[in-house]
Amino acid sequence: MLPYEMVIAVLVYLSPAQILNLNLPFAYQKSVLFASNSAKVNERIRRRARDDNDDDPYFYYKQFIKINFLTKKIINVYNKTEKCIRATFDGRYVVTRDVLMCFVNKSYMKQLLREVDTRITLQQLVKMYSPEFGFYVNSKIMFVLTESVLASICLKHSFGKCEWLDKNIKTVCLQLRKICINNKQHSTCLSY
């Protein structure tokens, strides 16, 4: 059997999906979470753990999913305005509401993703990425495939009738494309 420290050192180099698939015991969950994050993030996790008095055995898995499986990315949306969007660690899926909030015309938002499946839940994503993971993830967050968003919003522009709207759409598409291109395993994203 390998020493504990060596196992943790190896686990840090696995993707979040691969780590979830292992269904690690409690001590390993905590160690992998702390090993894969910065000291600042680890301090926040420690504070949350102290505040959580019910001794939830899945606390560290929940934090791992929240921090490592889902990542926050800052993107430009229009005229030097930035928004934070949450995406999976590989950039394949983004939170539907975050994408919609990137557009400055609020009445236009609902039309953008009309033909796109926006009902993918966090539980479905975890099962898709990590089929061996046995814990139920309770979350109301809905996701959408980044490539589907690009395919949908790239076609939605005003053809010069509204310059600021066209710039907003183009900027968001370029930013989402960057997220998609940074994905090493699935680089089949559409161009704008």
UniProtKB/Swiss-Prot annotation:
List, alphabetically, the InterPro entries matched: ORF45 (IPR035125)
State the protein's purpose.
Plays a role in the expression of ORF41, which itself is required for late gene expression.
Query: Can you name this protein?
Result: Protein ORF45
